[in-house]
Amino acid sequence: MASQISQLACFSSTNRQFHFQSRSFPCPMIRPQSFVVKSVDGNSSETPASLSYTAEVSKPVVEKTSKPYSTVDETATNKESITEPVEEDVATQPIRAAKIHDFCFGIPYGGLVVSGGLLGFAFSRNLTSLSTGVLYGGGLLALSTLSLKIWREGKSSFPYILGQAVLSAVVFWKNFTAYSMTKKLFPAGVFAVISACMLCFYSYVVLSGGNPPPKKLKPSATSPSY
């Protein structure tokens, strides 16, 4: 009888100790998490709240990863917009050339020299004036005509301009020498002045870079040769 009473006393003491430990150390695993979710979202279900929270957190990550690509595209477009005006400026740069073509005055000048030699021979019967007029005047006419032909083809007529400048210098020197010896204004004085003006004109065309290019080239000149 005494042993049964002692067993009951031991059982009651262990039961009290178990209840005391369960009261003093509660398990905080599930309830605080459900309480935090309910206090933030205000929903009764726990699973949708956690899913919405993870979706909201993932949005800034996507935005952050997409920003560097957008900045790279913006920098690329900015570089293209900067380089385009430079290319346009290079393409629209004007070509350095004279305002007037050499043959515009070269052909009339050559014809005037030839006619002056013929008139001088007709009045004075001087073979020197005839040879000078025909030789140098014919050379000026030939060079001016060739310069016009080459210019129409879109090629450079710079050598023909230099040739006309040399011939005009020779005609000027001969007529100036004849005028200084005879003191006759016509024809030596007049041709000396005209030749000096033409020499200045040819010098201007040469220093300016030659004749200006034609506005419309022929198809044969623009098409590449194979």
Curated annotation (Swiss-Prot):
What name does this protein carry?
A: Protein FATTY ACID EXPORT 1, chloroplastic
Recorded GO MF terms: fatty acid transmembrane transporter activity
Please report the record's description of how this protein sits within the membrane: Multi-pass membrane protein
InterPro entries in the record: TMEM14 (IPR005349), TMEM14_sf (IPR044890)
The UniProt regions of compositional bias labelled Polar residues, in chain numbering, are: 67-80
Q: What is the lineage of its organism?
A: Eukaryota, Viridiplantae, Streptophyta, Embryophyta, Tracheophyta
Q: Which GO terms describe its cellular component?
A: chloroplast; chloroplast envelope; chloroplast inner membrane; cytosol; plastid
Q: What induces it?
A: Up-regulated upon induction of early leaf senescence.
Question: What happens when the protein's gene is inactivated?
Answer: Reduced biomass and male sterility. Reduced size, thinner inflorescence stalks and flowers producing short siliques containing almost no seeds. Small vascular bundles with reduced secondary cell walls and modified cuticular wax composition with strongly reduced content in C29-ketone wax components.
Going by the entry's taxonomy, the superkingdom of the source organism is recorded as Eukaryota
Q: Which UniProt keywords apply?
A: Chloroplast, Membrane, Plastid, Plastid inner membrane, Transit peptide, Transmembrane, Transmembrane helix
The source organism is Arabidopsis thaliana (Mouse-ear cress)
